[in-house]
């Protein structure tokens, strides 16, 4: 997926550096093409396509191209510290192309579940009275949000994993495994607006649904969990050629384990975080970190084509 011959000015240019010891180096290409039924006369877009730096992730290069070039483009960080780009398009257009290219290093060493030994009830109690800095920061992610409703059914679903005194890492991973084992990945079963309660009842959905479900279950117990958007490196079966553009955007979650410690969990695949996961942004739910959202004037018809290539 080559970038346009005359791309819009990149957010940042940097020469890729050698990967650190114990890190996997990736180049990620993300292409979004919007096709409209009529001319768009005015458009506002908010993009979460710029990866954030984390303790386990180092961004060594980032380029963004936009065609047609925006009339206004500004860059800043949102409430959660995620980089975001705001665009205004003032000229008529029937197609919008947004392409990014990311050079990034992801550490292979991750926090071990066995080290997350604080009993889950202790963390719940800390969040009830968040006097420590870590608890105060985490408390943002302990309550219901627009796309994550809480309730008794979700609490009841989580409780078999959260027996009395069980360490947070062990309990949260058990819940991750249960979602993976008991639910079916089905891209036709849900939409972006499907409530968490419906996902729990039907036991079908996609990565976004399963992340929201586990977040809702954890918060219903009084724990803190945040939604993470990013990319997943996929490996084709033996003997099968790798298809360029066939990698995927992905969603998972992080549960707060005390102080400044968070544990990534991927219920879609039933495993903890690994170097196969590349973080873009995190927030309370998908609505905080949607790759692209906004308002257009001029057409009620649009098609979106997305291609992702994770080369590691």
Regions found by a protein language model. Give the residues of each.
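Intrinsically disordered, low-complexity N-terminal segments that are enriched in acidic
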Residues: 2-129
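Glycine-rich, flexible loop/turn motifs
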Residues: 76, 116, 181, 188-196, ...
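Alpha-helix N-cap/helix-initiation motif
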Residues: 21, 200-204, 242
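Glycine-rich, small/acidic residue-mixed loop/short-helix segments
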Residues: 47-57, 62-65, 269-290, 294-303, ...
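Hydrophobic/aromatic-rich core segments of domains that either
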Residues: 3-4, 177, 209-298
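Short, hydrophobic/aromatic alpha-helical segments in well-folded domains
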Residues: 35, 157, 161, 195-199, ...
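Secondary-structure boundary elements
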Residues: 119-205, 221, 284-286, 298-301, ...
């Amino acid at each position: 997926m080559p970038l346009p011959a005359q791309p819009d000015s990149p957010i940042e240019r940097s020469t890729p550096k050698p990967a650190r010891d114990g890190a996997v180096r990736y180049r990620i290409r993300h292409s979004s093409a919007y096709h409209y039924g009529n001319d768009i006369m005015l458009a506002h877009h908010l993009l979460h396509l710029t990866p954030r730096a984390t303790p386990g992730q180092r961004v060594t290069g980032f380029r963004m191209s936009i065609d047609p070039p925006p009339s206004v483009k500004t860059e800043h960080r949102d409430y959660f510290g995620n980089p975001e780009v705001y665009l205004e398009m003032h000229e008529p257009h029937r197609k919008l192309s947004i392409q990014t290219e990311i050079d990034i290093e992801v550490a292979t060493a991750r926090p071990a579940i066995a080290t997350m030994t604080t009993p889950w009830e202790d963390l719940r109690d800390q969040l009830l009275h968040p006097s420590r800095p870590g608890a105060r920061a985490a408390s943002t992610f302990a309550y219901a949000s627009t796309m994550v409703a809480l309730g008794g059914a979700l609490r009841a679903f989580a409780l078999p994993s959260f027996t009395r005194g069980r360490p947070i890492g062990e309990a949260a991973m058990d819940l991750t495994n249960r979602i993976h084992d008991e639910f079916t990945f089905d891209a036709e079963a849900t939409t972006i607006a499907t409530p968490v309660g419906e996902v729990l009842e039907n036991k079908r959905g996609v990565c976004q649904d399963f992340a929201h479900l586990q977040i809702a279950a954890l918060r219903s117990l009084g724990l803190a969990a945040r939604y993470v958007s990013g990319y997943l490196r996929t490996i084709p079966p033996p003997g099968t050629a790798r298809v360029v553009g066939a990698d995927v955007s992905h969603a998972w979650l992080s549960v707060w384990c005390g102080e400044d410690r968070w544990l990534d969990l991927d219920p879609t695949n039933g495993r903890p975080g690994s170097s196969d996961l590349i973080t873009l942004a995190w927030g309370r739910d998908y609505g905080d970190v949607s790759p692209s959202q906004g308002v257009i004037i001029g057409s009620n018809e649009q098609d979106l084509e997305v291609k992702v290539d994770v080369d590691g």
